[in-house]
Amino acid sequence: MQDIMVYDEAHYFDVGTSETPDIELGGVITEMTESTNPKETEKQYIHQKSSITKTTGYANEFPITMDMVKGDKVFENFYKKFYERKTGNDLNIDHYIVNLWESETEANTYKARKITQTVSITECNGAAGEQKQITGSLKGGDFVYGTFNTSTKTFTPNV
């Protein structure tokens, strides 16, 4: 058995354009949680004492906290969306979640998921004498399952 640590899961983001992708490691993220936020329906028939709950979908969300570090492309992308109060598709980003503990046969290749999410940065804060941070969430999207090569920064969907 092997403990899986937070650093065993890498988060990459495409901070480029559709014409020129630029996939970068989220290097200044200090906290991130993956929440499924299941959507459920509940039903009870007259012959039942208890209701039945069915999961009908998910509202994926990743609450995030990042240090403000000039030169980190992921931070600069997220901060620009916050600072300029972007809306709509200008908030979308491709997010790659790479399981570094699940290597594939090809060198530097691991099981991974890709999800297009909305960047929702809600706060920019900091106390006197401390480094500033931004906080918010990455919201929505459906997962595409595949592999990710950390050397070439290429995602390959499963067939």
Where are these regions (language model features)?
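Short beta-strand and beta-hairpin "edge-sheet" elements
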Residues: 32, 98-146
